[in-house]
Amino acid sequence: MSKRPSISFSEFEVPQKGVAVVLVAKGGGFADEAAKAVGGAEKIARIADISGFTGALGKTAEAIETTPAGVEKIVLVGVGEPGKLGNDDWLKIGGAAFSQIGNAERVTLTLALPETTIAGDEAADVALGMVLRSYKFDRYKTRKSEENGEPKHAAKITICVADTHSARKTFEVAEAVADGVIQARNLVNEPANILGPVEFAEEAEKLEKLGVKVEVLGEKELKKLGMGALLGVAQGSVRPPRLVVMEWHGAKGKEKPIAFVGKGVVFDTGGISIKPAANMEDMKGDMGGAAAVTGLMRALAGRKAKVNAIGVIGLVENMPDGNAQRPGDIVTSMSGQTIEVINTDAEGRLVLADALHYTNDRFKPRFIINLATLTGAVMVALGQYHAGLFSNDDELADQLYDAGQSTGEKLWRLPLGTEYDKMIDSKFADMKNSAGRYGGSITAAQFLKRFVGETPWAHLDVAGTAMGSPANEYNQSWASGFGVRLLDRLVRDQFES
């Protein structure tokens, strides 16, 4: 696995050994502190000139070059136009810097720009970007680390910045969020033969060490609760289902909780409506929503969030054996509503139907947000740079959108409406689980909406962003951990004033 760097903050100093990293603005501008760090402004100019480096955001240039103080390598990191930096740009800068440090044991990053003051929270974002970029899932590779291109040791990184106190304090929070993102990535990257519903639940139970109350419901409890929709999906697999309830109580008094629900199909063959063989291996990631909820609960507990939060994940495997549910079957959900199964590959919404109703009925939350790798249709509509956002509450939708813009985990709102709702009406039951080809992500959301009553609710379709999304400066992993930073920001901005 990846070797996570050790990061500290310091006032400006001249690096004594290892790698010196400095920032360069678009057009070649850099601060006096950067020039001092590398032994002279002419070195920065020469490296930039030889490399054709312009200072564009996220671009880098490097040179094996010594300084009088003992530095062996100099790295330039472009920041673009300093006055326009925002959202996740500082994470990109940190990730780009980390990508160039190689096997260095000591790294000094000088965070200074001409006529610009870099705040402590921006420095913390740079550090977070470095931690997230350091992630690598290779636990099943048996080659030696040097053959696999992995650093021999964890780097010790010193970030020099004007406001060290604020940077340290903010990074303490950011590290807890990084822990949550990394947990989500690990869960999604794990192969399905290793991580089934039982094993996933065991991973969630480890959050008890952080003060999270964890309850795991097995098949008997689910039957007693009447979760026919979830159990219908699970009946084709020899691996028993689980429903995991995670509670974090960080607010004073008996404040109503906020709730997050995740789809956790640990492997999705499609069931009897079986998927094509090509790329089916990616369906180990069909629990990306549950992974994000688990990672979020870890982040909230790790930073001692002052909020009461509930995380509920439905864990099943969708397999096509002789006991699997069939197209045409009718199941009764926990809510009492009946569902005709048109397509067994539209299984995630069945799992969520019972998980959403259970969460709403038991906890009476202020709102519910569910995450699910639910439809390929949302990828057709939005590609892999935005997750789909559906909501019955404009205020909640706006808050989520803003959190997405702030973190770079972007959302785009798609419609709901009675016309779409009619498309899931069934001739034989209260509703059907698939309405056909058109508006697939919308009709899936309409289906979920029937299980939340009047509670403010949002559905995030993360099929295009939780796994296999394009790599960026701070994520080179197949699993992105999408949703953890987004929802943590929502909680901080809106519910921890």
Swiss-Prot record:
- What GO annotations for molecular function exist for this entry? manganese ion binding; metalloaminopeptidase activity
Question: CDD domains under this entry?
Answer: Peptidase_M17
Q: Return the cofactor note field.
A: Binds 2 manganese ions per subunit.
On the tree of life, the source organism's domain of life is Bacteria
Q: Does the keyword Disulfide bond apply?
A: no
Which cofactor does this sequence's record say it needs? Mn(2+)
State the top-level EC class.
hydrolase
Q: Say yes or no: keyword Manganese present.
A: yes
Instruction: Cite the binding residues for Mn(2+) 2.
Output: K263, D268, D286, E347
* Pfam family of the protein (one): Peptidase_M17
Instruction: List localization entries.
Output: Cytoplasm
Q: What keyword terms does UniProt attach to this protein?
A: Aminopeptidase, Cytoplasm, Hydrolase, Manganese, Metal-binding, Protease
| Role description | Presumably involved in the processing and regular turnover of intracellular proteins. Catalyzes the removal of unsubstituted N-terminal amino acids from various peptides.
Protein's name according to its UniProt entry: Probable cytosol aminopeptidase
Gene source species: Brucella suis biovar 1 (strain 1330)
